[in-house]
Amino acid sequence: TFLTVIAAHAANKTLYAGKLKFDPVTSFAPVSLVGIAPIMILVSNDLPVKTVGELIAYAKQNPGKISFGSSGVGAAAHLTSELIMQVTGTRMVHVPYKGTAPALADLMSGNIQMLLDVPIGTMSQVKAGKVRALAMMSKERVPGAEDIPTIVESGGPLIESSSWVMFMAPAGTPKEIVDRIGDEVAKAM
């Protein structure tokens, strides 16, 4: 039996300390990284900002007035939003959702003002003009989304953040099996 995990898996040990019946780190062995994508900063069309620099300035002038959604407590987007607030000295309100779809719907309707997520689930709404992408949280522009600036180009601090998907095996799975499955996944990708 193998498990597919996302980046939030890495935070579970800390977020749910003492509440889990297993150790998210030591109970599994990594098999293969399947994919990785940078986090994108999205805002509602109603928010009067066009860059990350303007977003930071607006958040400082309006502490607690910007609400940001995430696909759930402990998700990469949630933790990255908290890091942005810590680094920039801003205060925003976290609204956790059960997945990206309801958060994106609320962003489009203006119920929340900001959402961080990977491009695959949100780019169609950006291209349709239903939300604005301020930046990718990467050092370089992202292939296929070259028109979206990096966070630094958009006036923000250099904070890189991404989400990933990984195959994991139960701890104690023989190394030969883990290596072979990892090699086969790499060939398939």
Please give the residue ranges for each predicted region.
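Hinge/capping helix and adjacent helix->loop/strand transition within the periplasmic-binding protein
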Residues: 1, 10-102, 151, 164-189
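Paired acidic/hydrophobic, glycine-rich loop segments that form the ligand-binding mouth/hinge
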Residues: 1-5, 113-117, 133-135
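Short secondary-structure boundary segments
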Residues: 6-7, 45, 118-120, 138-139, ...
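Small-residue (glycine/proline)-centered packing/hinge motifs flanked by hydrophobic/aromatic residues
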Residues: 17-25, 140-159
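Conserved helix-loop-beta element of the AMP-binding
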Residues: 29, 55, 130-143
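Conserved functional loop/turn residues at catalytic and ligand-binding sites
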Residues: 51, 96, 110-111, 130, ...
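Short helices/loops that flank or line small-molecule/ion binding pockets
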Residues: 83-87, 101-111, 120-130
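Flexible glycine-rich beta->alpha loop in the catalytic core of nucleotide-sugar glycosyltransferases
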Residues: 113, 120-121, 139, 157
